[in-house]
C-alpha cells in the first residue's frame, strides 16, 4: 500500500464560523490553527495546504486568564532606529480586536509561504456579523 499524498487541486475546503464570546485566547487560537493547517482531516499532508476557512466572530469578547490582560506585551518596530513600540493585551484589544487573535494564530502556523497561505484563510471580525454568508459556513463549537 502506497503512502497517500494530497494534491493541492484535490483538497476540498469547507467554511466554518466560530463564536469567540468568552473563550480563552490560547485555547481558541490552538484549535483554529489546527483547522487552518488541516490536521483534523485524514488527508493531512505537511507540505500541502489542506485546511479549511475559519470565520471568527465576536473577537472583542475574547479573554485571557490570570494577569495577562496587563502583563502580556505586544511589540512592533517601525524599521527606524529606536522605533520599537510596546502595548499590552487590553490596549491592543480595545484598538484592534482582530489583531490579538491573528497574532496568536500566526505564531502557531508554519513560517514561510505555506504558513502565509494558511493565515489568509482566517477571517476575524469584532462584531457578531460577517460578510461570508454566501459561503454557507457551518457553526463550529470549540
Curated annotation (Swiss-Prot):
Keyword Ribosomal protein attributed: yes
InterPro entries: Ribosomal_uL13 (IPR005822), Ribosomal_uL13_bac-type (IPR005823), Ribosomal_uL13_sf (IPR036899)
Gene3D superfamilies linked: Ribosomal protein L13
Keywords: Ribonucleoprotein, Ribosomal protein
GO cellular component, one term: cytosolic large ribosomal subunit
GO molecular function (one): mRNA binding
Biological process (GO), any one: negative regulation of translation
SUPFAM superfamilies xref list: Ribosomal protein L13
Coiled-coil residue windows: none
NCBIfam families listed in its UniProt record: rplM_bact
Family statement: Belongs to the universal ribosomal protein uL13 family.
Role noted for this protein: This protein is one of the early assembly proteins of the 50S ribosomal subunit, although it is not seen to bind rRNA by itself. It is important during the early stages of 50S assembly.
Record's subunit section: Part of the 50S ribosomal subunit.
HAMAP family: Ribosomal_uL13
Protein name, per record: Large ribosomal subunit protein uL13
Species this chain originates from: Aromatoleum aromaticum (strain DSM 19018 / LMG 30748 / EbN1) (Azoarcus sp. (strain EbN1))
Amino acid at each position: 500500500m502506497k503512502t497517500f499524498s494530497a494534491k493541492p487541486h484535490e483538497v476540498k475546503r469547507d467554511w466554518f464560523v466560530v463564536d469567540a464570546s468568552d473563550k480563552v485566547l490560547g485555547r481558541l487560537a490552538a484549535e483554529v490553527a489546527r483547522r487552518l493547517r488541516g490536521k483534523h482531516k485524514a488527508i493531512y499532508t505537511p507540505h500541502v495546504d489542506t485546511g479549511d476557512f475559519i470565520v471568527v466572530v465576536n473577537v472583542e469578547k475574547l479573554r485571557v486568564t490570570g494577569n495577562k490582560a496587563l502583563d502580556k506585551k505586544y511589540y512592533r518596530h517601525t524599521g527606524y532606529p529606536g522605533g520599537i513600540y510596546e502595548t499590552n493585551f487590553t490596549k491592543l484589544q480595545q484598538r484592534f480586536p482582530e489583531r490579538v487573535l491573528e497574532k496568536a494564530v500566526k505564531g502557531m502556523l508554519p513560517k514561510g509561504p505555506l504558513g502565509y497561505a494558511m493565515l489568509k484563510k482566517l477571517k476575524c471580525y469584532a462584531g457578531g456579523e460577517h460578510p461570508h454568508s454566501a459561503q454557507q459556513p457551518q457553526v463550529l463549537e470549540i
